[in-house]
Amino acid sequence: MKKRIAIVLFNLGGPEDIEYVKPFLFNLFYDKAIINLPNPLRYVIAKIISIVRERKSQKIYSLIGRKSYLIQETEKQKLAITKKLKEILKEDFIIFISMRYSTPFAKEVICQIKEYNPSEIILLPLYPQFSSTTTGSSVKNFLQNIDIDIPIKTICCYPIEEDFIKAHVSIIKEKLYDKNFRILFSAHGLPKRIIKAGDPYSFQIKETVNKIVKELNIKDLDYKITYQSRVGPIEWLKPSTEYEIELAGKLKKDIIIVPISFVSEHVETLVELDIEYKFIADKYNIQYTRIPTLGTNKIFINSLTNILIRFINKTDTNLVMSSSSKRICPNKFTKCLCNLIN
């Protein structure tokens, strides 16, 4: 008898129009994984932030067509994975998209999954590197809302997956040139307190970059890992991407910037990297090259497809592990997904 498999792609979400910016911001900051405070304090803070930041965020989204492109980018990835899986897989399957802070929310997706009536569910985050604030939050929210007894296999991360690394390397090589350049691998930032609490995100970012640099095989490659999108006065991961662009500008080094934790084009790449950070580079009259996100890159889609095939073929039920089929983080990282949901 054929399996019926429900595959769920997790992503952040985003406003479909600038009128939805405030509820999107509220949902984001009301998440306990983002602001770890009890209610009603967290509710009040999320309300205040969403009101205060609404107009500024609307102006940012107005620069890219008044909406987030992440939703349609994720839909393209879903279609690409579906097409590739159909070439290989004999089992019946449907791929669903579940956004954390905008529609379609987990509750809506679970209703659709019930109608499909699968024999198992596979959860695949579109966050290559695990964090309790992204994949962890999405998985916990999904599991809290699901009310059917179906085996669930969860892919927590794939920071060193072979084809994921190859996809980055192939795109970077297309943009390399024989000049005085520095590569900045720019990842979304996190408050340091989250890392100190045992989150493996920055460790996995380093693992990804180390693998890419090794595969690039360029002698004395000048590169740095940087972090962007800082919000608020608390201490965040360093160095900031903005700071490193300023530093490179003073040294008259050209910049090649790689969005290492983003697999879809959205506001942080299209505005922050393409407009705000490019402005800094232009100020110093240095060349600024931004590498595209992986999107529907064939090697990347192959990577996700291969991960799914491996998990479909596993006989274990209620499985939680990395794409490598083993724990890849040292034990000191206590915010591993296995610890969070068990």
From Swiss-Prot:
Name of the protein described by the UniProt record: Ferrochelatase
Family of the protein in this entry: Belongs to the ferrochelatase family.
Enzyme class per UniProt: lyase
Annotated metabolic or biological route of this protein: Porphyrin-containing compound metabolism; protoheme biosynthesis; protoheme from protoporphyrin-IX: step 1/1
Function: Catalyzes the ferrous insertion into protoporphyrin IX.
InterPro entries in the record: Ferrochelatase (IPR001015), Ferrochelatase_AS (IPR019772), Ferrochelatase_C (IPR033644), Ferrochelatase_N (IPR033659)
Cellular localisation: Cytoplasm
GO-annotated cellular components: cytoplasm
Organism: Rickettsia typhi (strain ATCC VR-144 / Wilmington)
GO molecular function: ferrochelatase activity; metal ion binding
Reaction it catalyzes: heme b + 2 H(+) = protoporphyrin IX + Fe(2+)
Pfam families according to UniProt: Ferrochelatase
Keywords: Cytoplasm, Heme biosynthesis, Iron, Lyase, Metal-binding, Porphyrin biosynthesis
GO biological process, one term: heme biosynthetic process
Protein residues bound to Fe cation: H188, E268
